[in-house]
Amino acid sequence: MELRSALQSVCRTTAAAASASARSSLAGRHAFSTSARFQLQPPPNPYVSGKSRIETLRAALSNRKPAAGAAAGGSPGATSASSALPPRPPTANDSPWSIVDAINKDSNSSTSSSSSSSSSGGALYSSSKPSPMQTWNETDFETRHMAPQQELNIRLRPSTGRTFYVSGHQDFAGALKLLHRTVAANKVKKDVRLQRFHERPALKRKRNLRERWRARFKEGFKAAVNRTFELKNQGW
């Protein structure tokens, strides 16, 4: 019985100690998280206006003493350090082209120091020259850099002579004359007249025979006349 009571007292003591440590740890964690939550600061504002940046840079440049570099001596290191200073920030009264002119000046000075031949090619667009966006012409760009689109001539049926393609060296009047000549050679008017009215098969057969005999008579007559002139030229 004494051993049993001793074991029970030891178990009670161990359980009480474990529960007390757990409560203290929970309270400490809660107190730590609460204090940490109260200690959090609001995040800084990442946005800084351009005007404030310009004012800060201007104040930093004004606080610098340019005489310190000159007192160090005329060494090349001092000149390079002075040339490496950032440019003066633009003010509200400066024109937008002042920055471009400054860039042109810097590029010209760098190219002229490296080689005299490339000094003229380093300039960008200045205020005296128009901007490339001001002189942009889409039609002129397409005519100079894009191939002209070829018109598709799809021949799904025999040509009727109603279309005539005019080249660049031909005028409108000459094109109309060539069109009328092509229409007459293809007998377009005759075909249109025959298509407008219905023609009986017997009349069509007679017309074809008549036209065939007329064409043969015309060709035979021309051949006889040509033969006569050939014999006359030969001295007969």
UniProtKB/Swiss-Prot annotation:
Stretches the record annotates as Disordered: 65-136
Bias (Low complexity) ranges: 107-131
One of the GO biological process terms: translation
Compartments, as annotated in UniProt: Mitochondrion
GO molecular function: structural constituent of ribosome
Keyword Magnesium on entry: no
Keyword 4Fe-4S: no
Pfam families the UniProt entry points to: Ribosomal_S21
Cellular component aspect of the GO annotation: mitochondrion; ribonucleoprotein complex; ribosome
Main localization (coarse): mitochondrion
Quaternary structure and interacting proteins, as annotated: Component of the mitochondrial small ribosomal subunit (mt-SSU). Mature N.crassa 74S mitochondrial ribosomes consist of a small (37S) and a large (54S) subunit. The 37S small subunit contains a 16S ribosomal RNA (16S mt-rRNA) and 32 different proteins. The 54S large subunit contains a 23S rRNA (23S mt-rRNA) and 42 different proteins.
Family, similarity comment: Belongs to the bacterial ribosomal protein bS21 family.
Function: Component of the mitochondrial ribosome (mitoribosome), a dedicated translation machinery responsible for the synthesis of mitochondrial genome-encoded proteins, including at least some of the essential transmembrane subunits of the mitochondrial respiratory chain. The mitoribosomes are attached to the mitochondrial inner membrane and translation products are cotranslationally integrated into the membrane.
Protein name: Small ribosomal subunit protein bS21m
Species the sequence originates in: Neurospora crassa (strain ATCC 24698 / 74-OR23-1A / CBS 708.71 / DSM 1257 / FGSC 987)
Gene name as annotated: mrp21
